[in-house]
UniProtKB/Swiss-Prot annotation:
SMART domains: Frataxin_Cyay. Disulfide bonds: none annotated. One of its GO terms (molecular function) is ferric iron binding. The keyword Lipid metabolism does not apply. The lineage of its organism: Bacteria, Pseudomonadati, Pseudomonadota, Gammaproteobacteria, Pseudomonadales. One of its GO terms (cellular component) is cytosol. This is Iron-sulfur cluster assembly protein CyaY. Signal peptide: none annotated. It comes from the Bacteria. InterPro entries: CyaY, Frataxin/CyaY, Frataxin/CyaY_sf, Frataxin_CS. Involved in iron-sulfur (Fe-S) cluster assembly. May act as a regulator of Fe-S biogenesis. Keywords: Iron, Metal-binding.
Length: 110
């Protein structure tokens, strides 16, 4: 069953807030900007992670130095998974944060 528009927006809002919370609590030197549904994480070295919502597809998109990734929400598992690799958003985000900032953060709750 496809996500309703309202459910999709609630999920993306909660996910983006959880991502912000992890970075805020980490003490890592990053700039966070959330505007018009787009969350941008700017690392000290200038690299960025950009999270945006694609409402027609009901996907959360992530743009990073290593490429662009599209995530579908699995209601049964309560998690976002990449539509091409099945890698979980939490795992990919932890890996990318380590690659870009050298920090080992836990995103398992997103």
């Amino acid at each position: 069953m496809s996500l309703t528009e309202a459910r999709f927006h609630d999920l993306v809002d909660a996910t983006q807030q959880n991502i912000e919370d992890v970075f805020d609590e980490s003490g890592l030197d990053v700039d966070l900007e959330n505007s018009a549904g787009v969350l941008t994480v700017k690392f000290e070295g200038g690299s960025q992670l950009i999270f945006s919502r694609q409402e027609p597809l009901r996907q959360l998109w992530l743009a990073a130095k290593s490429g662009g990734f599209h995530f579908d929400y699995d209601e049964e598992e309560s998690r976002w998974a990449c539509d091409t690799s099945d890698e979980l958003l939490s795992e990919m985000l932890a890996r990318m944060t380590f690659e870009q900032a050298g920090a080992d953060l836990d995103f398992s709750e997103i």
